[in-house]
């Protein structure tokens, strides 16, 4: 068993060895290194063929047409292209956008940018289990609403939104619907023929592919139009200029092919590990699972251990690679904005830790993690006067603290 144990799959995954092996064949002189846009010689044709194959593999995972897949540098760029691209293109129809307070920063920040440009954005409050109330979404829709952006699976708490139902509402009102599926692609079935979703952001490195490559699904029927955010040689049907990174695209394609093939196996494996970890720590008293436990991907377990500072717990678990919040915000000491949006008080939000597992996590690693967590939580609580008061039955919310 290799230490530290990696339990932060929601931040990034190791590249599957099968993917790495394939990528290496597209970089050097003895491989297929050409520019896929070079139309005048075999080096270019072979690279273009490799890109076409990857496009099909990615489309297959969504049951989409390969022509609906646009390559980008990752889900952040896809989110930006989808949100700003759609809002700008349809701005003559209206300037109102709807999203949710628990979205990833790559969705919230483009929305903030739109606000600076004069758009109006409604940020929905999720319920305390992290899920969106469809009635509230319906009530927020207006005649000038041009875009709804709701993530499929939340990166911090792993809850699954009802994308199919939201899609129905949007299609009824002829509103463009964007979904950030960075955390769900390869983990849950996504079928664009069944779901009325117009734009889907995808990332390779959350699906055992390389970092720095992603894609945006752009529906053709009914046709969705976007304003390009990256201008240049007109690659990717004008949606996204820039030479295609063949080796990364091949890696993403292979990763998505494997994910489709092994989805059920990966799901069952993660579920067994999730339940094992939860059963191993839930009797520690004052343990809360954040987010709905049923409507959730099995790869994620976000837990608050009351009276234990999340940061101190991370420090104590030096042999476990885990996180509090998302990797993008883990440098700030602010409590997680996602947990706050669930109506959680700062203390409990501060005491949360996210464990996320994947294809290469073993039962042995989970058992070791359980042991480490139990020791650390017990030790930290022994040091806490608040824990003593709680054990004595003092209601801490009624305590008046003296200011010095």
From Swiss-Prot:
Provide this UniProt record's keywords sorted from A to Z: 2Fe-2S, Cytoplasm, Iron, Iron-sulfur, Metal-binding, Pyridoxal phosphate, Transferase
- Reaction catalysed by this enzyme: (sulfur carrier)-H + L-cysteine = (sulfur carrier)-SH + L-alanine
Alphabetical list of SUPFAM superfamilies matching this protein: PLP-dependent transferases (SSF53383)
One GO cellular component term, please give it. L-cysteine desulfurase complex
**EC numbers:** 2.8.1.7
Query: Which organism was this protein described from?
Result: Vibrio parahaemolyticus serotype O3:K6 (strain RIMD 2210633)
Name of the protein this chain belongs to: Cysteine desulfurase IscS
Family the entry assigns = Belongs to the class-V pyridoxal-phosphate-dependent aminotransferase family. NifS/IscS subfamily.
> Any idea which positions bind [2Fe-2S] cluster?
328
- Pathway stated in the Swiss-Prot or TrEMBL entry: Cofactor biosynthesis; iron-sulfur cluster biosynthesis
Question: Which cofactors does the annotated protein need, by name?
Answer: pyridoxal 5'-phosphate
Question: Catalytic site residues?
Answer: 328
* Compartment annotation: Cytoplasm
Q: Which domain of life is it from?
A: Bacteria
GO terms for molecular function, please? Answer: 2 iron, 2 sulfur cluster binding; cysteine desulfurase activity; metal ion binding; pyridoxal phosphate binding
């Amino acid at each position: 068993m290799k230490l530290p144990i990696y339990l932060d799959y929601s931040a990034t995954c190791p590249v599957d060895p099968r993917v790495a092996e394939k990528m290496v064949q597209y970089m050097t002189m003895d491989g297929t290194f050409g520019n896929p846009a070079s139309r005048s010689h075999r080096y270019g044709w072979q690279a273009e063929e490799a890109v076409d194959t990857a496009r099909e593999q990615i489309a297959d995972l969504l049951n989409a047409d390969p022509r609906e897949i646009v390559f980008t540098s990752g889900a952040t760029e896809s989110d930006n292209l989808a949100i700003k691209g759609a809002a700008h293109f349809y701005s003559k129809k209206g300037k109102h956008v709807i999203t949710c307070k628990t979205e990833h920063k790559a969705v919230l920040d483009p929305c903030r940018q739109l606000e600076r440009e004069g758009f109006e954005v409604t940020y929905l409050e999720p319920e305390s289990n992290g899920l969106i109330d469809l009635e509230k979404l319906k009530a927020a829709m207006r005649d000038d609403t041009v875009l709804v952006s709701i993530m499929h699976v939340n990166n911090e708490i792993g809850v699954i939104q009802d994308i199919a139902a939201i899609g129905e509402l949007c299609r009824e009102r002829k509103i463009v619907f964007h979904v950030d599926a960075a955390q769900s692609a390869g983990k849950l079935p996504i079928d664009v023929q069944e779901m009325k979703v117009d734009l889907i952001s995808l990332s390779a490195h959350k699906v055992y592919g390389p970092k720095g490559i992603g894609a945006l699904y752009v529906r053709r029927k009914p046709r969705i139009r976007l304003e390009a955010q990256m201008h240049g040689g007109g690659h990717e049907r004008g949606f996204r200029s820039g030479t295609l990174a063949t080796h990364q695209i091949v890696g993403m394609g292979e990763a998505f092919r494997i994910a489709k093939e092994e989805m059920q196996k990966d799901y069952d494996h993660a579920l067994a590990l999730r339940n094992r970890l939860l059963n191993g720590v839930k009797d520690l008293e004052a343990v809360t699972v954040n987010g709905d436990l049923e409507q959730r991907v099995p790869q994620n377990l976000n837990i608050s251990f009351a009276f234990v500072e999340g940061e101190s717990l991370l420090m104590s678990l030096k042999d476990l690679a885990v996180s509090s919040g998302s990797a993008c915000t883990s440098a700030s000491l602010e409590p997680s904005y996602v947990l706050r949006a669930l109506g959680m008080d700062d203390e409990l939000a501060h005491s949360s830790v996210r464990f996320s597992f994947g294809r290469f996590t073993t039962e042995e690693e989970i058992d070791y993690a359980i042991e480490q967590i139990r020791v650390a939580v017990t030790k930290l609580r022994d040091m806490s006067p608040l824990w003593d008061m709680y054990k004595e039955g003092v209601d801490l919310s009624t305590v008046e603290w003296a200011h010095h």
